[in-house]
């Protein structure tokens, strides 16, 4: 037998041996990986403020062999449309669902119905009382109080603080605002609530009329918009709020934002997928820890712990 023919016979055998080794012994132990799990994620809106949380979800999905499908209402923060999406995904047999609720009052019935048919985890707003299997949230009461106290440090007694109400309804974002209002009023500050919208002219008018000493936003997207307005307005009030996006970190560094409640939203996204996957697969599960936050100012934004909150993904 010629050397050439022998080579042609042996080469495929070597290839098959390598393939067998990869399948049987390669890192990751593919043969022990859990079966692929389909999971739907129902967002409140399509804003980029959830991008860090989404990266956390995607990292968990890669680690846990989960296929994610992101769904967004056509109208931002439409709880009614979220309820429709929840009913549709449940009826379609989705194995697990993550939901960022816009309004408990509107979504309660749909959540209760879905929770009996699929693994359902809510993010940001707790709906375990309606039957959700778990909730990945932060302490909204403590967060709102902390922002209220921060604003008190910058605004004298008797002066006005303007709170931006960006998500009407029964939800975690509103819990933050109500806690901040209570803290400010108890400390002797005047509180005004402004219904946030895309109408920047209206907001400018409110600032001119009320002349607040500080403005507080309770969502990252709203804080980022207000910080951008402050760029071209030297008389803009002190600005406080929730969020830890790159745009907000830049505004904090430049002094356009006075202080923020920085949230570990990457961790929130990861924990949500992890919890839903464990519930869907009927695995042993110890519960979800409360998502951490920290009040961050320009002078301490580069502390190690705060860096992890501001820049959780490199």
Where are these regions (language model features)?
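Extracytoplasmic "Venus flytrap"
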Residues: 38-56, 60, 69-80, 104
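Flexible loop/hinge segments that line or gate small-molecule binding clefts
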Residues: 104-142, 245-253
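Hydrophobic membrane-insertion alpha-helices, especially the h-region
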Residues: 7-24
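Hydrophobic alpha-helical segments within soluble ligand-binding/sensing domains
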Residues: 135-160, 244-248, 263-281
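Short beta-strand segments enriched in small/hydrophobic residues
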Residues: 25-53, 63, 133-134, 160-168
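Hydrophobic alpha-helical
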Residues: 98-116, 196-249
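Hinge/cleft segment of the Venus flytrap/periplasmic-binding protein
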Residues: 267, 271-314
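Short, solvent-exposed amphipathic alpha-helices that sit
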Residues: 49-64, 143-147, 168-190, 225, ...
